[in-house]
């Protein structure tokens, strides 16, 4: 692996643990990415799509009501306002442009909440690429509005009936397809995880989130935030937010994993703090595994956080103490979901609700503390309203 152009590791985490047949494919992808990053024409086309199709920059919104009676200022980075409804659209546009540059004629992707699938479908429709999306059968059921959106935009959605019928199984099927069709096909991985160079590519195609946030907060407040908070599943929205703040040592970075029904129940999706290091999905990173190394089922009310591993850069930031990683239960996330809707008129995705819940916890712990917090509101909650209605009111799913 010494002949890669970019460092494939973050400390001990990362790497390229894939079938031999895919090694040259990943190296070709890395080469194309490095060239594209240095090509002003590629960068201009990407920037144009982000601005005039996706709707960047997204707003930075001050919460006027949630912090009443406290000395906290809480801002939300509004990735929910991006075309497609979540941060996923950013890097999807970048990767499809890259795939076209490489002469690929077909896109495949995996999706959990369906947001990455929707982003892939809309970008493929606009950039005229055929698209197949693998999705766990369980997720197809709980995210039916997104399945309909994908099919409406011309994507072929394949429900995966294997294993736990969730995101990890969709990832495995997508990998299988790619191994068989890599000459014509680009695997558009949806998070900052997987084999090198994906964690680096996804970070670079998401880092405008943090770059914009930094500019906007300086403009609004004249200083950097004390704390930046983002939800962590695979970790793309969080690394996109954190990347531009990593060198700002006075800014605390907090990643929020899903505690599900409670860490002690085993039904959670918090491998970073409660898993062990192993090899999964083409990388070395913390994973939820039993003593025999078998991957355990992750669980979260939020389909997009229901993943048994985490991106290698998050593992590294945790190890060196640059970022803190905490967890929030389903119940806490549901409460935050309702609070934001009720008090600010914004319905957040259940993924983003985990980050918001931790921010509200921080505020509650110390209402007299003068602090400036930014939460990455990574997506909107339209896709989750039936799930939440069912839990709160026994409504139809």
Curated annotation (Swiss-Prot):
Q: What is its EC number?
A: 4.2.1.20
Residue(s) carrying N6-(pyridoxal phosphate)lysine:
88
* Keyword tags: Amino-acid biosynthesis, Aromatic amino acid biosynthesis, Lyase, Pyridoxal phosphate, Tryptophan biosynthesis
What's the protein called, per UniProt? Tryptophan synthase beta chain
Alphabetized CDD domains for the sequence: Trp-synth_B (cd06446)
The source organism is Haemophilus influenzae (strain ATCC 51907 / DSM 11121 / KW20 / Rd)
Task: Note the superkingdom of the native organism.
Answer: Bacteria
Q: Does the keyword DNA-binding apply?
A: no
Which Pfam families does this UniProt record tie to the protein?
PALP
Q: Name the family the entry cites.
A: Belongs to the TrpB family.
Question: Which NCBIfam families does UniProt cross-reference here?
Answer: trpB
Subunit info here reads:
Tetramer of two alpha and two beta chains.
Q: Name one GO biological process term.
A: L-tryptophan biosynthetic process
Q: Which GO terms describe its molecular function?
A: tryptophan synthase activity
Q: Which cofactor does it need?
A: pyridoxal 5'-phosphate
Q: Which reaction does it catalyse?
A: (1S,2R)-1-C-(indol-3-yl)glycerol 3-phosphate + L-serine = D-glyceraldehyde 3-phosphate + L-tryptophan + H2O
A GO-annotated cellular component? cytoplasm
Provide the function of this protein.
The beta subunit is responsible for the synthesis of L-tryptophan from indole and L-serine.
Record pathway: Amino-acid biosynthesis; L-tryptophan biosynthesis; L-tryptophan from chorismate: step 5/5
Q: Does the keyword Amino-acid biosynthesis apply?
A: yes
